[in-house]
């Protein structure tokens, strides 16, 4: 089954890197949507089916934690795996993300292998994709 993925980051360059990495994972990906902040991401999720989200934590307007809380509060999106992306030293925010139900996290700067390993772990855990 092909998956629809949403990449959320305020940096267009990071979004492009994540899209390239996702295409290299070997996952059957139908569509990669993108958004520049949490509010945009909610709009994308309202308009399109999304099976997995990779989101930065630190963003303007609506940050990744606020976005994650909104996703988890929605019966429609509650089961969608959300992987958080954070900078070094973001332990407090990572802890909050895990408490809110994040499927995992990756630290910036990340490698393609780290993203692949995290997604493989989500697949092995049986999270719906």
Q: Which role fits each region the language model picked out?
A:
Residues 59:
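Receiver (REC) domain active-site loop signature in two-component systems and cognate sites
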Residues 12-33:
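Two-component/phosphorelay signaling modules centered on CheY-like receiver
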Residues 66, 89-104, 117:
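Alpha4 helix (beta4-alpha4-beta5 surface) of REC/receiver domains from two-component response regulators
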Residues 43, 65-78:
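Short amphipathic alpha-helix used as the core "switch/output" element in two-component signaling
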Residues 48-54:
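Active-site beta3 strand of CheY-like receiver
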